[in-house]
């Protein structure tokens, strides 16, 4: 596939957020060519993640508008900028909100995926190379979001945030691996590492929590206990391997960690916290068994949050860990997660509960705000 648009400005449709909390507007925008170490992508499928909604609502952070949101997507490389050697036009790719420069100490460490250059930055609305946007309308800039901005038919990303995948993989399924599903799956498989036959508690049964449960199912956990305040999520969660449910509301003043300890003869082997609520974090840590229990924090807290637990909980040989994007390095590791799906070791279809055409993207926001969807697939109408 040779690109006849390379080096030129592309006019295309994008869903622009003009102000906080207001419906997105489909506009014709201009997308500039990729600069040094950048790639321009044709987006084919994108899905809505709660992080998009959070920054669109702009309740807890500095608002930056107009902006093009979106960061879970699949597409095809349209053209590449100077210096890009590992990607070419026609490659099937997933853009990722965090990156891998492959040069820094984090990228060279086998333990970390938190690239110094390209790790997530929710405040930055411009490209790293020159501090400019690649999107504009009527000569005025439209800001980027987490380096991806996939609610546009074309977008420009840093090449370190673009993962080349098996061209046989269906982009309308594997695109969910570019954020939430990998975050939960990797939190379990790469960080909690439950053994076959073990017990695992998952706090929060949204997309990330269900992906964490899927990880526990793949690992062969014998009991997967789902904890959520919304009982309507319990039925769905069974498809992801969850065997038992705890709704904290059903237990009065009894702390959920005590409820779980009583269910499991002293505590679970592993827990994964996916809500970002500090009380849930304490419960997730204190519900693991002494001697070997490991709790993993995934959910993102509010700015001023802090939690406390007695140091004896740690001295009694419990471990508390944190993780970011499931400890996956985007370029090095995500292709193998796609391969897991292709080998039928990982199920993705069950995460995709709704589908809408790009022109109806605001419906995806409605489904998520009402708590009806796990993932809503948005199909571009090129």
UniProtKB/Swiss-Prot annotation:
Can you quote the record's cofactor note? Binds 2 Zn(2+) ions per subunit.
Q: Which cysteines are joined by disulfide bonds?
A: none
* Top EC category: oxidoreductase
This protein's GO CC annotations: cytosol
Q: Which residues bind NAD(+)?
A: 51, 204-209, 228, 233, 275, 298-300, 325, 375
Where does the protein end up?
Cytoplasm
Q: Which Pfam families match?
A: ADH_N, ADH_zinc_N
| Residues where an alcohol binds | 51, 71
EC number per UniProt: 1.1.1.1
Residues that bind Zn(2+) 2: 101, 104, 107, 115
User: Which residues are listed for Zn(2+) 1 binding in this entry?
Assistant: 49, 51, 71, 179
Q: Which GO terms describe its biological process?
A: alkaloid metabolic process; formaldehyde catabolic process
Cofactor (UniProt): Zn(2+)
Among PROSITE patterns, the record links this protein to: ADH_ZINC
UniProt keyword annotations, A-Z: Cytoplasm, Metal-binding, NAD, Oxidoreductase, Zinc
Q: How does it assemble?
A: Homodimer.
Give the record's family classification. Answer: Belongs to the zinc-containing alcohol dehydrogenase family.
Q: What does this protein do?
A: This protein is responsible for the conversion of alcohols to aldehydes in plants and is important for NAD metabolism during anaerobic respiration.
Query: Under what name is this protein listed?
Result: Alcohol dehydrogenase 1
Which organism does this record belong to?
A: Petunia hybrida
